[in-house]
């Protein structure tokens, strides 16, 4: 199954935070799609 992205940390660069949230959104989309 999909691997949940790990939070890069509060002191991570903005690019890493943006990438994390994008990955998290895709992860949640995949998880919810498989659930129903």
Swiss-Prot record:
GO MF, one example: neuropeptide hormone activity
UniProt keyword list: Amidation, Hormone, Secreted
Primary location class: secreted
Presence of the UniProt keyword RNA-binding in the record: no
Disulfide bonds, paired cysteine numbers: none
GO CC annotations on file: extracellular space
Compartment(s): Secreted
GO biological process: feeding behavior; neuropeptide signaling pathway
Protein purpose: Hormone secreted by pancreatic cells that acts as a regulator of pancreatic and gastrointestinal functions.
Protein name according to UniProt: Pancreatic polypeptide
